[in-house]
Amino acid sequence: MHSPKRKKLTPADLAGLTVAIVGTGREGVSLARMLSAQGDVTLTAIIDSEGGPGEEWDREFGRTIPVHVFNGDSDLPEGIDVAIMSPGIAPHRPLFQVLARSDIIMTSGTDMFMAVYGDRMVAVTGSKGKSTTSALTAHIISAHGVDVSWGGNVGIPLWDIRPADVIVAEVSSYQCSSLTSSPMVTVVTSLFEEHLDWHGSAEQYFADKLNLLAHTPQSVIVGGQSQILTQQMDLLYPHLPRTTIGEGSTWSVSEVGGEWHITRDGHTVMACSELPLLGHHNWWNVAIALEAASTVTTIDTDTAITALRSFHPLPHRLEPVDDPSGVVFINDSLATNPSAAAVALGSLRDRRVIVLLGGADRGVDRTPLRQELTAHPPAVIIGLPASGEGLLRDIEQWCVEAGVTPPACVPVSGMDEAIAEARNRARAGDVVLMSPGAPSFGQYRDYEHRAEDFKRAIADTRP
């Protein structure tokens, strides 16, 4: 593949140029809105789909910005100086490669945003935990009276974020891959194989994810519970100073007197049971967020405790769903890979669990899920399409090889059947966890659509 011609640019640098926005999804709309308001840039858009630019783009711009449909080979509009790539355009796609072979300078909305706001930015990434950690960080900073905004890869495009004194943003591996600058503070929560269809390999995914750290950030904070993250940091950035949570960090998680606590300099601050977040992994996210917040403001312990108690968990991340039956339904639809599902199951080992697994199979490493299921088998596994039936066969074989009795494994044709089976097999106090460990495409628009279907099926069968 060809390497693109990249250059660190700000919106002001685009004055008088012809700029192509490549991709007309949410990020593309946000960029076009910002550059249209600037008024001194000639805009066009490029897509590689016959489906058109999408409803949001049409509603916002109509025919005011021309949209070119890429048909392959060297089919690009003439006169383009700069192409701003949307995160969804993977490097292996023909459109990306044609642009990379051209003389057009390529950048991204994320790189431009960091060029402008990086010196006031706390950027959070990670294979798991980045949304919760970024939201917690912003919540804690705000509680201390600091003017802070939050957004990014949480449904709020970077260029739609209010330019506050401190900006906390979640960034994805797609966004990190092309950066030519780093933010003031970089946070990496965890690392495991993900999005191999976009990045091409696990090694490239790790490198792209950690490219967030490549351009001398002032502070680097990493989670200490991810062995792969530690290994990759040692491999790729061995001389970069970093704070590892749980290894001499100010904030940590410790077991004291048989109960887990958030600690500050080794002293207990609050019991983890007081947190409005499920799961041991989320306790570590709290410690990461406190450490990140402390890079931009002095943390008052009492203020931090009050902020943590008032935090509202984000939807689709171990989110309880109300039900009068006494069965605890939990929506973890954002668990789109096996490692995330393993983390969710690991946080509920003290409960009788019926878990819904399955979706689109991307061929990622399932070792963490295999280890969790064979070490701590749930009571029942319900296999969702399309991968569920095959996954159940594999799980039964894993258990046989591990010398453990396989749990009840039930393939289903869809969500209605899954919830009906779960209700038939659950009793009061049990947990019915949807943590699919797979993406939703092929069955749903996205993980949010899958979560909506889960909640609908629960509501439709309430006693």
Regions found by a protein language model. Give the residues of each.
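Short, conserved loop/helix-junction motifs that constitute active-site signature segments
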Residues: 39, 179-182, 212-217, 235-237, ...
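Beta-strand->loop->alpha-helix junctions that form or flank phosphate-binding loops
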Residues: 45, 70-71, 107-112, 236-256, ...
